[in-house]
Amino acid sequence: MHGDREHVSYLVAHPLLRHARKMREIEQFAGLDLPESTPESICAAVANIFHVRETEVGLLELSGRLLNFLYPAELKAAGAIPLSSSAVAARTARTKQAELFNDFTQVKHFSIFELVKLGDTGLDDQVIQKLMSAPVLAENGEVISVIQVSRKAPRPAAAGDFTPYDLQKLVSVARLVGRLMAKGKGIAQASSA
């Protein structure tokens, strides 16, 4: 009888614990100081939420018909992604849909960006194996940015899959990024100061 009560308690508490964990993770991000938000601070918070390296987070701003990297800084000068291209970030911006790829090496993408040395990581056998991509929307529903979280490793099994829950979390984070961009003077302006 005592075991039944524990089981019922677990069934009731389990979704509540999962919700509390999700809220803590989102609060980590929402706790950023809005006036001081920069692409670097936002992407560092996102990396922390998803337990990835900061160089595994990308933030691109839509400017006209091009997506330009705001973060990582090393990719700012590497070029832009045309909105009309088949790149994942471009598709995310066009469709306004979040996507998850646990087989990213099989997806057609702009691998040129993977050749740019990021931070002190150097060029090694670490390639993007897994990727999530989500649109960042303005209050009017227009795409203003795209945020991506990846996992790099020498082979797919070493990277660990993203889950549908991770993608939901990224969509929530993208909403917060949109609010940061709307409430502040904009992330791009903060990064150029």
Can you say where each PLM-predicted feature lies in the sequence?
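Regulatory sensory and allosteric helical modules in signal-transduction proteins
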Residues: 68, 76-114, 121-124, 132
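A short, aliphatic-rich beta-strand micro-motif
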Residues: 129-138, 145
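Regulatory loop-to-helix N-cap segments in sensory/regulatory domains
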Residues: 2-10, 143, 151-173, 180-189
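Signal-transmission linkers at sensory-effector interfaces
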Residues: 1-37, 176, 183-193
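Amphipathic alpha-helical regulatory segments at dimerization interfaces
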Residues: 11, 28-32, 40-49, 91, ...
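Helix-loop-beta substructure at the N-terminus of cytosolic sensory domains
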Residues: 28-70, 184
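Conserved beta-strand in the GNAT
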Residues: 148
